[in-house]
Amino acid sequence: MRAFAVAIISIGLSAGLTDVQAQSWQPSRPITMVVPLSAGGSTDVIARIMAPGMSKVLGQTIVVENVGGAGGTIAGARVAHATPDGYTFAIGQWGTNVATGAIYSLSYDLMKDFEPIGLIATQPFLIVARKSMPADNLTQLIAWLRANDNKATAGNSGVGSPSHIASVLLQKAVGVNLVMVPYRGAGETTQALVGEQIDITLNTPAISLGQMSAGQIKVYAVTSKQRLAIAPNIPTTDEAGLPDYYFSFWHAFWAPKGTPKAIVDKLNNALVQTLSEPATRTKLVDLAQEIFPREEQSPKALRIYQQSEIDKWWPIIKAANVKSE
């Protein structure tokens, strides 16, 4: 990961909170962390890893609430229109806070209607298939997909999700048309794969490695340039026969637009302190997460990074003709 040049961004105070009140803000009731996807996926898992540490720093309970549906846009609208007082913020990721803007007609603006809090970590996917898939390596899987053009099914976590866009790019790289099957999150997609209701999916190491060890699925490659430290036996896509196919996605926190800078800074401090805890770092690394360096965990760095990702990916997504329905 690279360091990002950042610009100073002034953030106005929300109505009803003075400078002094914001500076001295100490939460007096539970804080809600909105998760824009269903339980069981990597976004939910990361949220539940981060919440206890941030609660400790802030001195108040953080309640994790899953608000799934429509690629995360239901949760996005809720947080965008929430009272900007520090008691509601969201975890999001590349799909919910980049890709959705190129696919859905949103009631909010991804860059203008949120205050960035900070980046957390990034991770690759694993290319996985149902247990009964008659392919023992990625080359054989690609041959099977080509032989089953327009019939092979690819599950994903919802339209515009990282797994959906990664599947769209996979079919382009392989030269086939996959039947896309959207679910309400990675948890449901995983259940469908284990239940052999779909042929393949792209899923996170955090979810897939357990099923691989239990013999419930087949794993073919990791979508990164390097092998995973926690699973060095899994080849990269380059090594497995699909050169130049890479995909990773990241997670971060956002607050509603107008949340006072002093409160955003306190939430960011809770993020930074939690990510500095060895126990938290170990849990994330064990899930194949690459934690962003300290200098890239600031609100300003997230704003710059998110905009750069929008500039990079929107043309690709639109060119792929990805639709919300």
Q: Regions from the language model: what does each represent?
A:
Residues 81-87, 102-188, 200, 237, ...:
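Hinge/capping helix and adjacent helix->loop/strand transition within the periplasmic-binding protein
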